[in-house]
């Protein structure tokens, strides 16, 4: 028997910005981001992970909070989208993923797109 009850799905996600010693950078042309900002879903990029974030969204966040040459760390790399976005922006990126299948899928996902961007 199937359940007819509605399933609730969250309509937002939270992010953490970790920094050491001094306040984080904020490269947003003087505009504030108060509690949230809207983003259009990315339905074009193939999904390799159930909680995969859109690369354009991650690129925007990385642009705001880092400069070229900075390091971006993703402790739960999943699809590798954060690593791809960081590489596209000239940041060094390190990701960690405990699940071997996700690691393998993310590795293919990121490397194929980095190689595409090198030859375009």
Task: Give the role of each language-model region.
Residues 110:
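Conserved hydrophobic residues forming the short capping helix/wall of the S-adenosyl-L-methionine
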Residues 106-107:
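Conserved SAM-binding loop
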Residues 114:
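Short, flexible loop motifs at catalytic/binding sites
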Residues 118-120:
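Acidic, low-complexity intrinsically disordered tails
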């Amino acid at each position: 028997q199937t359940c007819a009850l509605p399933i609730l799905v969250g309509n937002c996600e939270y992010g953490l910005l970790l920094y050491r010693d001094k306040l984080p950078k904020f490269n947003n042309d003087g505009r504030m981001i108060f509690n949230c900002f809207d983003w259009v879903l990315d339905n074009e990029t193939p999904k390799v992970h159930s909680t995969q974030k859109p690369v354009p969204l991650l690129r925007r966040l990385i642009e705001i909070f880092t400069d070229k040459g900075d390091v971006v760390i993703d402790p739960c790399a999943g699809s590798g989208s954060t690593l791809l976005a960081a590489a596209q922006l000239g940041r060094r990126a390190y990701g960690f993923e405990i699940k071997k299948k996700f690691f393998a899928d993310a590795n293919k996902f990121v490397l194929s797109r980095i190689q595409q961007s090198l030859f375009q």
